[in-house]
């Protein structure tokens, strides 16, 4: 019997050599995801071309989805090795520089102090670390860690989407989109979609003349506008990491099931993503 459920795998630092990629394809990878939030454009183009080459060498068609960064707020990089934050400890946040440390986290969002309110819960990564904002001190926010963990690299910072003054897709997204449409990408995933208008702003030919557009459902606004988003898209992704930062954890399985059922009713493929190997 043919396998109807397809496997999407992200091509990252551990899998971007030809040998590993070949093994992933032989093991059953149907679609390679290339996340555009990290690395240079040249590096991502090289990954794209490598997937095409290896799949061609194996005589197998492997789809490629490029995942646009979207208006994601990210921390400035930590020192090599990262930091460990323990429950009950205090951390400061601001927008002052290009590096983060064990007691001060810089963020690449200029409106952080205006958009975040006292009492807000902010999560780093996909919920690895959660803090509560307790006070303002000059041009800094002071927050207490309520769920400790490790941070390294440039983790995302989840700010409540109803106050985030950023739209999707961003100008940078549209520039990246042009590059990968020209290269012939099969699919494009759009981050932090809030309405069908965000999908229409891409301005690309719909599949099959252009790439399939995948709307990532990761905000409360997207859930509220779900039917219109599904109708405007070629497929939908349940992005459980950021969606789980906006919804209570016990609500997430019900939201996931609801989104998938709506996709089935409207005849669109549904993708479940984030921490699949840990769940």
Task: Please describe what each predicted stretch is.
Residues 1-279:
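Non-catalytic helical/linker scaffolds that mediate oligomerization, partner binding
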């Amino acid at each position: 019997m043919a396998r109807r459920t397809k496997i999407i795998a992200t091509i990252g630092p551990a899998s971007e050599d030809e040998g590993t990629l070949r093994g992933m394809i032989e093991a059953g990878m149907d679609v390679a995801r290339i996340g555009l939030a990290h690395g240079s454009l040249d590096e991502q183009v090289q990954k794209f071309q490598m997937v095409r080459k290896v799949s061609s060498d194996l005589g197998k068609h492997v789809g490629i989805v490029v995942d646009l960064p979207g208006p994601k707020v990210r921390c400035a990089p930590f020192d090599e090795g990262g930091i460990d934050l323990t429950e009950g400890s205090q951390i400061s946040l601001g927008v002052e520089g290009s590096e983060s440390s064990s007691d001060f986290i810089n963020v690449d969002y200029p409106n952080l102090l205006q958009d975040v309110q006292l009492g807000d819960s902010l999560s780093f990564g996909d919920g690895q670390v959660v803090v509560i904002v307790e006070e303002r001190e000059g041009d800094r926010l002071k927050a207490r860690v309520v769920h400790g963990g490790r941070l390294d690299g440039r983790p995302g910072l989840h700010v409540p989407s109803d106050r985030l003054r950023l739209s999707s897709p961003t100008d940078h997204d549209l520039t990246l989109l042009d590059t990968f449409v020209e290269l012939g990408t099969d699919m494009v995933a759009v981050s932090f979609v809030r309405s069908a208008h965000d999908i229409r702003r891409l301005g690309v030919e719909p599949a099959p003349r252009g790439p399939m557009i995948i709307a990532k459902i990761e905000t409360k606004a997207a859930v509220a506008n779900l039917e219109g988003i599904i109708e405007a898209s070629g497929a939908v992704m349940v992005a459980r990491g950021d969606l789980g930062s906006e919804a209570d954890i016990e609500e997430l399985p019900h939201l996931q099931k609801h989104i998938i059922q709506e996709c089935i009713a409207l005849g669109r493929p549904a993708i479940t993503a984030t921490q699949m190997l840990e769940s």
